Amino acid sequence: MNRKEFIRNMGAVVGVAALGLGCTKEAAAASNIEKVSVSAGKTAVVYFSWSPDGNTRFAATTIAKKAGAALFEIKAETPYNSDFNKCCDEAKPECYGKKLRAIKPIEGLDLAKYDVVLVGTPDWWGTMAPPVRTWVTQNKDALKGKTVCIFQTHGGGGMERVGKEFAEVIGDAAKILPPKAFLGSSVKSATKALEAFVTDRLAVK
């Protein structure tokens, strides 16, 4: 075996070891999550997605199906531009300024009916999408005494500030489960990971 082959083979070994370590850490983190017992029909998934076939919509739909949850969509009163660059021009200053964007009432959603609320958002510039921030801010009193959790789709930045800022808005009146970030580019082929988000956190009776 020459030097070049040795280096190549060692690189492969290190890569596999790193992958295994990552999976081990992921499994260990999941095993440390305290599951919440919830009755069937007492979970709601509330989400915002920029586009009709968006990653966050897919994630929310998959999670709701696994949890046997009711599914509700947050919609901006004035929708963001469907052109990506123009949407960025609108949303970026809102995100950096932690501004609230007006949203429509969610038809049929009565939070009093639910014990667990899972909130879905895209990660925009490291934080919640403004319509999600608006909804959480408007409903933080109604979420008191409930179990809540945020999940997000992202473009590569991971969780960033989303989980932290969600917890800051909610405060200590609700039980907050560990957040979860899903890579947007692969979320539509990550059904098992989306389902594990539910089974790691909830024990549906």
Language-model features: locations:
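A short beta-strand-loop structural module common to alpha/beta enzyme folds
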Residues: 69-83
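C-terminal segment of N-terminal export signals and the immediately downstream linker at the start
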Residues: 23-53
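A short, Lys/Arg-enriched amphipathic alpha-helix followed by its capping loop at the start of a domain
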Residues: 59-67
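Short hydrophobic segments within beta-strands
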Residues: 46-48, 74, 119-120, 151
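Helix-loop-strand module that forms the ligand-binding subsite of alpha/beta enzymes
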Residues: 86-174
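Glycine-rich phosphate/pyrophosphate-binding loop and the adjoining helix
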Residues: 14, 175-205
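Solvent-exposed loop/turn segments at secondary-structure junctions
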Residues: 50-53, 76-79, 123-127, 154-158, ...
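N-terminal export signals
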Residues: 5-26
